[in-house]
Amino acid sequence: VVSTGSTNDLRISFERRAELTLSAARVAALYRYPVKGFSAERRSSLDVLPSGKVAGDRVLAFRFGGIEVLGDAWSPKATMLCLMNTPGLATLTLALDQDQGCVSVGSEGRTLAEEALDAAGRQRLAEKLAEFALSLPENPLVGHPERLPLQLVGDGVTPRYHDSEKGEVTLHSRESIQALAAALGGELDEVRFRSNIAVEGVKPWGELAWVGRRVRIGRCLYEVTRVKGRCLATHANPTTGVRDLPILTTLTHAFDQEQPTFAVSMRPLGEGGRIMVGDDVELLDV
């Protein structure tokens, strides 16, 4: 959680973003999300694959029944059980053990399910998640019997179920978190934004000016391709599952954004590689 800091001007002119550059930036935290829309897994390192995706990231998803998609193929998040449509999922802890090929589901320190990723285990996990979702006041299953049974898709290895089929690595600065927290008047957990990389040492919103530029992180070189549009998933408190902060309207009203954006997407220039907490971050195209 990042506390608010004082600020004299919460409104930033995004025409001046090119002025916002790096100052001794470093990687502060790394995350991946093995199951689409569920728990963050904090890491000391991440391996970025030649495909441009993080190894072990979004390798599974709970997809609605009746979706006409071939096998484990990618589909939009609107076809899945996720924080955007079911904020209460944030109260669950889902852990993937890739070595053992199993998924465990926990809540408030209790294990609700632990199953292998075989056909029978996937069915039991899907049934448990559907039962849990239907118990929540906000869920996409009530009144939609065609969305059942849920299907647990993915091979547990291949990164696939990102917001876009292209995937890519996502990054935000903690200075931007602090600026947004100040506008909201409270504390803000960066996990709301589900980025892979959090950096420190960047002026607030400076990373938004990196689009089209090259960034070196440790020994790896990336091109920043676009800013990241946001959805209602960011409104869900990562601990309580309650939609408790107006993230989207704050981004547009307090910071003059036409569309709510936070963080950037990047692709590796080359074969990818390993990113470590503490790695230097260098903007090459100043």
Region annotations inferred by a language model:
Residues 2-286:
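Metal-cofactor-dependent catalytic cores
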